[in-house]
Structure formats: C-alpha cells, structure tokens
C-alpha cells in the first residue's frame, strides 16, 4: 500500500492535496529532485511520521502516473497521484503488532496510538532511553 501523509489543511510545500486526482505541473524525472508529488509505502510510513510532526492523517495512494522510487530516502514521487478518503493515523496503527513495530522504530510514534497498552507505553519509553 502506498500512503500520502498529510497535515490538517492538506497543504504541503505549496501544493494543495484533495481526494481524487492530484497533478504536479512542475514534475521532473530526476530522482533527487523535489518537483513531484511525494509519498511512501506502508513499510516506511513510521519513518516519515516521525520526520513530519504536523501529520494528522493519511490518504491511500490508489493510483499514480510516472512514479520514480528514491530507495535511499524510502519514498516515491509521481507526476500524478489519485488519493483515497482521509483516514486517521491511528487506523494505520490498529493492531498490537503494528504498534509494537512503530514504537520500536521510534518511541515518539506513540503519539499516534489511541489508548496504548502498558506494554506499548513501556516499549516507547525504553526506545527513547527514558528507562
């Protein structure tokens, strides 16, 4: 699954995202170039959540055109992406196993988990070196 993380107003680097098709008018094919619509996958979403503290929700990228993968940064970019409905970050972390992986990668990910269990809380604190 491909995922676009977004803030409350869905405005990112001057581009206003919406449900449905979104197209970058300044797209460039260069993998190291910022010109394009960036997104990640479900295996790397936690890395990006912690780099983007204003994230409030996500949308699934249901299709894309002219995708380029940037393996070193764990992200993709495309000229055009079609986004699904707005979903709360907590939906992505809806199972104990997903929560455990998230806080093991970065204890700060706990802020996206609704009602974390004591074990998840302990893992998060331990990960951040507070225990």
Question: Residue spans of the language-model regions?
Answer:
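Short, glycine-biased loop/turn motifs at secondary-structure junctions and
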Residues: 1-130
